[in-house]
Amino acid sequence: MDTTRAKLKTEHPLPPLPAVAHRLLELINRDAPFDEIGAVLATDAAMAMRVLRIANSVALRGATPIASLTEAFLRLGTAQLRQLVLGLVFIHHFPRRGAFDYVAFWRHSLHVALAAQQIERRSEGLNNSGQDVYTAGLLHDIGIAYLNLSATTRYKQVIVEARSSGEPLEVVEQRLLGVNHAEAAAYLLEEWRFPANIIAVCRFHGRPEEAREGHRDLVRLIHVADELVWGLGYDNGAKRVGPEFNPQDFAKVRVDPTQHEAIVAELKTLAEQVESCLA
């Protein structure tokens, strides 16, 4: 990994995030109370308006519209608003470059985050915090966006070759770039001081058996959620075809496979929330 880190540091500069985005990530990562998060949000009018718009779309329908960040906090609670802010920071502040399909990428990522939460709630014995589950799902493929940003022309060739050959994306990345998106994501989140379990998800969600025992439950959960979302037809913007999902895979995360239809139905009700985040 030392050689990989050196290559990433030399050839793939960290994405330039606005100061407000860095501050929000810092607060979210240390589970800061919402009054601190709200104070920073208030300095970014566009972000604050997005939070209020989405909060109104997911709050109690028919209730009085939410008009302030404080009211959003009281109506939705700290956990849900923290998730909302995290998603908006990445979706609207992570730099975009080239012809890469960022909308498909973030749609896939948001669905994985929500799917992982639905699966985890039905699991018998998993002990991950809801925030960790959401964050891990949202960022599991962040290395794709990072490599596209830092090596746009070469990454376009990665996408073309991966689609035409049918090879796994990380295999083509390794051949053409000398690094893959799992390694890139781990490096990026280490530099941004994300928790070790989130970093482990980025590095190992494609091969959960390689994660260390303390992280394996969360890694396996995101692995299953990712396959479920691919099975629902949400590609990640880089490849259009992904792994097939078998409901029996729910057993890997201690969920009864008969819950498959209920989980899919719940995800369909959350589709509006996903599209609101992308708007």
Residue ranges and their predicted role:
Residues 1-6, 21, 247-279:
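Terminal helices and disordered tails flanking the catalytic cores of nucleotide-processing hydrolases
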Residues 1-157, 162-163, 167-243:
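Conserved alpha-helical "signature site"
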